[in-house]
Design a protein with these regions (language model features):
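PLP-dependent enzyme catalytic core of the Aspartate aminotransferase-like
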Residues: 2, 110, 124, 299-300, ...
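N-terminal small-domain helix-loop-helix segment of the aminotransferase-like
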Residues: 8-135, 192, 356-359, 472-474
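Conserved core of the PLP fold type I
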Residues: 90-237, 249-277, 289-294, 305, ...
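Short Gly/Ser/Thr- and Asp/Glu-enriched loop/turn motifs at secondary-structure junctions
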Residues: 125-127, 393-399, 442-444
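Hydrophobic residues in well-ordered beta-strands that form the structural core
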Residues: 156, 178, 244, 352, ...
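Helix C-cap/helix->beta junction micro-motif
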Residues: 237-238, 387
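PLP-dependent aminotransferase class I/II
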Residues: 275-280, 284, 289, 293, ...
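Conserved PLP-binding catalytic core of the aspartate aminotransferase-like
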Residues: 373-374, 387-427
Length: 474
């Protein structure tokens, strides 16, 4: 799964969509929108009808396939409810700037500068360069509408967030191109990215962007600044946009390696003037070595974009608040238009701004949330370790990436599906995980376990069920 779908599969999909469009009076775009965003959606809905409940439904399903954080949600809800009480109808009931009220963008700019990027290259984040939408997904949808055209491709280091394929394709007609690194924990380097572009050339109109996520979903690792810059430098020198998704930036629970936001990158970083980067520039330069500091500055001003949101770090996936930071004035102008279709409701903007302005509360909450994430991660991985289940060491986000390939008869996607089905269908297991194939991993047998959306007892039950199944799986 490290390349685009085979031609035969694409032809079958096209025929199916054409038939669906004709039968149900849909456009081809509407027909494609009827496809589920990932393969396990049916299982999710089924599991939610019979969830595990201690004492009342002990044989219920445990869902560890959704990247949500409910561990500290009560703290957030209490503070937001307090903020909502002071919202004034005359300031929140009418139209406002569709890409975010002035107050919300100022609050977000201050928060992002203080928490995500204290060493921001410009000294401050300009609120006028922030574009707020109803969640990071809407931000990405709008952004790629402005920087790509139907038939274009976007490079994404794999494994990656399983909904990216749908997020790029369903409205904008853009294809995700998975690119594997040297191992599951590494970002691809210049040669691997070059090969991915060459392989996609015959199928796509062009490759327009590189989409990075740091910290990683599904791995839960924090990529080093140097690794991120290697990939970004290559793309910027090739004339591509670089989009950095940082929605897990404040969800670190182990201080393994410091998270460095792309908001802190400088033109010198992108150019590679630091002597420590010299080897990386030689190996991954892309576009030749004739770049100047002014070229790097211009590339950052027009083609480097950072996505952030409150869904993950603030246990607020239902509140739908995401933000784009870009220096490209024309993208901001386009967002003024398209943000109308997905703007955040006025009362929510008011409440979120008030909460973010309460810096003492924010700091205490983030500390509490990190502790809760750390405890949940430790509880899950301790049981997996007892069962000799290999995992990628993670330090951020809400995921554990497990490798169950040793329990498969063969290293095939069919065997991965059989193991995934056993986890879900076995009456003693009834566990829903994200299959690695949906994350476009290149090795069958790996799964994502999301540990922050269920209570501790359910999490531990799920881990023990998995270990028990693996002992008897054939």
């Amino acid at each position: 799964m490290s390349e685009l779908e085979p031609a035969a599969q694409r032809a079958d999909d096209a025929a199916e969509m054409a038939a669906l469009a004709e039968t149900h009076c849909l456009s081809s775009r509407g027909a494609h929108a009827t496809k589920p965003p990932f393969s396990y959606l049916h299982a999710f809905f089924r599991a939610m009808q019979e969830p595990y409940e201690p004492g009342t439904r002990e044989d219920g399903y445990v869902v560890l396939a959704v990247a949500q954080n409910f561990l500290t949600v009560d703290t957030v809800q209490r503070r937001l409810a307090l903020a909502m009480r002071s919202a004034q109808p005359e300031t929140t009931a009418g139209y406002d700037n569709m890409r975010g009220s002035d107050r919300l963008r100022r609050a977000l700019a201050a928060h992002m500068k203080r928490v995500l990027a204290p060493n921001h290259a410009d000294g401050a984040i300009d609120p006028d360069r922030l574009c707020v939408s109803a969640g990071a997904g809407a931000v990405i949808d709008n952004l790629f509408m402005t920087i790509t055209s139907p038939g274009d491709g976007v490079l994404i280091p794999a494994p990656y967030y399983p909904a990216f394929d749908n997020d790029l394709r369903v409205r904008n007609g853009v294809r995700a191109i998975p690119v594997a690194g040297a191992d599951a924990e590494s970002l691809p380097t210049g040669p691997a990215l070059d090969r991915a572009v060459e392989e996609a050339a015959a199928r796509l109109t062009g490759v327009r962007a590189l989409l990075l996520t740091n910290p990683s979903n599904p791995l839960g690792v924090v990529y080093a600044k140097r690794s991120m810059l290697c990939a970004a430098r290559w793309a910027l020198r090739e004339g591509m946009h670089v989009v950095v998704d940082e929605v897990y930036a404040s969800s670190e629970y182990y201080d393994v390696g410091p998270f460095v936001s792309a908001l802190e990158w400088t033109p010198e970083d992108v150019l590679g003037e630091n002597p420590a980067d010299a080897a990386d520039v030689d190996a991954d330069a892309g576009g030749g070595s004739s770049w100047t500091l002014e070229d790097a500055r211009r590339a950052m001003a027009t083609r480097l974009h950072v996505v952030y949101g409150l869904s993950k770090d603030f246990c607020a996936s239902g509140y739908r608040v995401g933000v784009l930071s870009t220096r490209n004035e024309q993208i901001v102008r386009a967002m003024d238009n398209v943000a109308y279709f997905c703007c955040v409701p006025g009362p929510m903007q008011f409440a979120v701004a008030e909460v973010l302005e309460d810096e003492g509360w924010v700091d205490a909450f983030l500390e509490e949330n990190s502790a809760n994430l750390r405890d949940a991660h430790a509880a899950l991985t301790a049981i997996l370790a007892e069962g000799n289940v290999p995992v990628v060491p993670s330090s951020a986000g809400m995921f554990v990436w497990v490798d169950l390939s040793a329990h498969m008869k063969a290293p095939t996607w069919e065997e991965e599906k059989r193991l995934w089905t056993a986890c879900f269908e076995d009456e003693k297991t009834r566990l829903l995980m994200t299959p690695g194939r949906d994350c476009r991993h290149n090795k069958p047998g790996c799964f994502r376990m999301c540990f922050a959306a269920v209570k501790r007892e359910a999490l531990e039950v799920a881990a023990r069920r998995l270990v028990d199944l693996l002992k008897r799986y054939e």
